Amino acid sequence: CLSRLHDTAADSPAHARPRVLLRFRFFDQVSERRRSEAVVPSVQAVLPRWQLSRQGRRGWLRLNGVVSSAADCRELAEQLWLKHEQLLKTPATPTRLTPQALVAASEPETWRQRYATALTRGIDLVNSGDLHKLVLAVRHRIVLADTFDPLPLLKRLRRQQAGSCRFLWQRHTGDAFFGASPERLLSLRAGWLRSDALAGTAGQGDSGAQLLRSDKDRREHELVVETITDQLRRNGLTPRRRRQPQLARHGNLTHLHTPI
């Protein structure tokens, strides 16, 4: 499929060229709304129809479409111009929405009991040797009073979580997945593949000195490093890593970080 992509603006910078966006899951999972219909695939790939990119003070707008005749080219050019005009008229600052105005109802905080049960089970699994490391997560359901626009929140995350990757995945109306992550899965540049082991987080009031001395966090961090390097070796690569982790700061959070 990628061989069928033809870039009509070959002189555009690398970040403005067509991008195929990928979404990965750890496992195949069933959506709650479609639990009886289908399994959500563990990998999704999308070539966006509209692509807007920016570097510094310059921006690029790209329209991806199917062309089979000269009329198709003309129609795409007109759509591109109309979208350009629409963007110029868009307010620079989105409307501010306070969290209190959005929340209509919140489920009772039964998650505390669920978390306590899972925590007890997790500690038993680690103590028995069945697991070396376990990360728990909590799901909280909130009913919104009005339509929610995630863009202002992403803008706030950009300021609060500088250096993180902000993402928004929305293929269907009313179904969006967004957030900010400091982790990089893989990057490939100039023949070099890079990954990052990011595990172990400093507690409140710790600038990172206590984190570097924490035996627990260092052991958990090393498990993540070993897992990544083992996977790379299984795929025929020869990973290189630092002997000691360093500190990586993302907003108010400080993590142990080992580039690979």
Could you tell me what each predicted segment is?
Residues 1, 20-58, 140-198, 240-260:
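Conserved, well-ordered active-site substructure
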Residues 94-184, 221-224, 228-231, 235, ...:
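Active-site pocket-lining segments that scaffold enzyme catalytic pockets across diverse folds
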Residues 2-139, 235-238, 243:
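Non-catalytic accessory segments adjacent to catalytic cores
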Residues 7, 11, 28, 72, ...:
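Acidic-enriched, low-complexity/disordered segments with a strong bias for Aspartate over Glutamate
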Residues 54-88, 180-259:
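Cytosolic ligand/metal-binding cores
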